[in-house]
Regions:
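Short, well-formed alpha-helical segments that are part of the catalytic scaffolds
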Residues: 16-31
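A conserved acidic beta->alpha catalytic loop
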Residues: 26, 43-51, 68
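Glycine-rich, basic loop-to-helix element that forms the pyrophosphate-binding segment
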Residues: 66-83
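Short aromatic/hydrophobic "clamp" motif used to bind/position activated sugar donors
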Residues: 88
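Conserved donor NDP-sugar-binding/catalytic core segment of glycosyltransferases
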Residues: 96-132
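Active-site-adjacent helix/loop segment of glycosyltransferases
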Residues: 118, 208-275
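Short, flexible, basic/aromatic active-site loop/helix in glycosyltransferases
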Residues: 137-175
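A short, conserved alpha-helix in the catalytic core of glycosyltransferases
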Residues: 168-170, 176-227
């Protein structure tokens, strides 16, 4: 049977009911896209009534309800398994869609001659620009981040370059990678890349996916014409737990790609529309 769904939106939640209320309202009521879509909600063992809220208010949503905890990447993979859309929109529940957020991602991707991962422009709640684009990690970046205490506002040039603080925020451009809060990818490419690597429980899985996209002859693009508010979901994990997960994922990343990783970014044959 022919598939008529343009976009499968996948969102993963764990006790994020308050975020889901705004997320779903912006998607279904305030700014519903003109393209056809489905929403897949993957619930990671919530106990705050998230599932009941979705079932009661948005019965059209597909729900994957975990009986045990899974990591961010694996949860998105579980959602992708039942997705039927031409494109997958990996979207955190702490997002708020604006007018044409999804329409523009779809239209832009349709114009490209090759499959890419597209990252929209993320905004803070006050509509100011939120830095979500990154450079690939290196031992020097890791050391600089460690020595500066993870401060995003440090004047350290290595950190500033890693955080792409000098990016032209209104220019469509190739990037190394973008945070996994909002990524748009053709389902065929996601399948080709085998989705997110489940070896990462949390952190680094988005960078890993983007690196593999580059190395498979595809690309990652920042597309600022699509804008989405990102309310910065704050995990309840203690600092020690978060640091442990960061270090563990970093170890997996370097073990997989090497300490001095290489990418095929510069060899991409893809031309961006208007460039």
């Amino acid at each position: 049977m022919k598939n008529n769904i343009d976009i499968s939106i996948i969102t993963v939640g764990m006790n994020h009911k308050n975020f889901l209320i705004t997320f779903l309202d912006s998607l279904y009521n305030k700014y519903p896209p003109y393209v056809s879509f489905e929403l897949i909600y993957v619930d990671n063992c919530s106990d705050d009534g998230s599932v009941d809220f979705v079932k009661s208010n948005y019965p059209q949503v597909k729900i994957v309800q975990n009986k045990s905890l899974f990591g961010f990447g694996e949860n998105n993979n579980r959602g992708a398994e039942i997705a039927v859309g031409k494109y997958l929109a990996i979207m955190n529940p702490d997002l708020v869609f604006l007018e044409n957020s999804l329409n523009s991602l779809f239209d832009f991707s349709e114009k490209l001659q090759k499959d890419v991962i597209v990252a929209p422009k993320l905004l803070n709640a006050d509509k100011t620009f939120q830095h979500s684009v990154r450079g690939f990690i290196t031992p020097w970046v890791f050391l600089a981040r460690f020595l500066t205490g993870g401060n995003d506002n440090t004047k350290n040039k290595t950190v500033q370059n890693y955080l792409c603080k000098n990016i032209s925020i209104d220019q469509t451009q190739f990037i190394d990678w973008a945070i996994g809060a909002a990524l748009f990818i053709k389902a065929d490419l996601y399948k080709k890349l085998n989705g997110f690597d489940p070896d990462y429980f949390l952190y680094m899985e988005d960078e890993d996916l983007c690196l593999r996209a580059w190395n498979s002859g595809n690309a990652v693009v920042y597309y600022p014409s699509s804008q989405i508010i990102h309310n910065h979901l704050r995990a309840s994990k203690k600092i020690g737990k978060k640091m442990f997960l960061h270090f563990k994922s970093l170890f997996v990343f370097f073990l997989k790609h090497g300490i001095f990783l290489t990418s095929k970014k510069k060899n991409s044959p893809i031309t961006l529309p208007g460039n």
